[in-house]
């Protein structure tokens, strides 16, 4: 296809492709650090779409029609810190690179079966995990200690474990970072799990009756 700088606006190492009628990820200059390709008609992200883009730090694909992302579409990007995929049609989450700090895949169709077991365990930099307005049945565990913000509102979460957030064997545990948990808009009654929040700086937002 056409080099992205003809279809999009290239400013320094940022590429702006918002609302450009794109159906595929465009070919990007090798030194690209930021990609904004919001509100297009992109339907899939393939394994080779970002190959060789070792400086790419930020990808925003909000408001496309992405129903499929290959397992390796993002995993091999060594510098990727922010991946924004809200308002798409994803049913499962692709593997994530180790450097990821912020993931937003809200307003998709992701069910718990679409998350690999332990999908977030090894993401030691992850601070913001936003999966609101999906079809999740469970809170994904384990969650890395780095996590600051967990948005799971408007899913189908009905239950949780005493150990979901806190280690019940370690009563002195404090998770200082994790101070923003949203579980509102789920069927779960949080008052049924009185011992599940002792390590948190503040209670989750959600139903307590």
Identify the residue ranges that each predicted region occupies:
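A structural signal for leucine-rich repeat
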Residues: 26-29, 48-53, 71-77, 93-100, ...
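Consensus "Asn ladder" position of solenoid repeat domains
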Residues: 20, 40, 61-64, 85-88, ...
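Membrane-proximal C-terminal cap and juxtamembrane stalk of leucine-rich repeat ectodomains
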Residues: 1-14, 167, 172-209
């Amino acid at each position: 296809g056409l080099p992205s700088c003809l279809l999009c606006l290239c400013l320094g190492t940022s590429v702006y492709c918002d609302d450009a009628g794109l159906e595929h990820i465009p070919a990007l200059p090798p030194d690209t650090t930021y990609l904004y390709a919001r509100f297009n008609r992109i339907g899939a992200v393939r394994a080779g779409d970002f190959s060789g883009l070792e400086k790419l730090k930020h990808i925003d694909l909000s408001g496309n029609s992405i129903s499929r992302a290959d397992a390796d579409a993002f995993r091999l990007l060594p510098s990727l810190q922010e991946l924004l995929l809200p308002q798409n049609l994803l049913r499962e989450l692709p593997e994530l690179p180790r450097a990821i700090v912020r993931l937003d895949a809200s307003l998709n169709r992701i069910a718990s079966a679409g998350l690999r077991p332990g999908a977030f365990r090894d993401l030691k930099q992850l601070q913001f995990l936003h999966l609101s307005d999906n079809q999740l049945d469970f809170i994904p565990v384990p969650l890395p200690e780095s996590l600051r913000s967990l948005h799971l509102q408007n899913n189908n979460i009905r239950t949780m474990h005493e150990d979901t957030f806190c280690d019940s064997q370690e009563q002195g545990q404090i998770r200082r970072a994790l101070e923003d948990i949203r579980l509102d808009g789920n069927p779960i009654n949080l008052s049924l799990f009185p011992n599940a929040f002792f390590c948190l700086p503040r209670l989750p937002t959600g139903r307590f009756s």
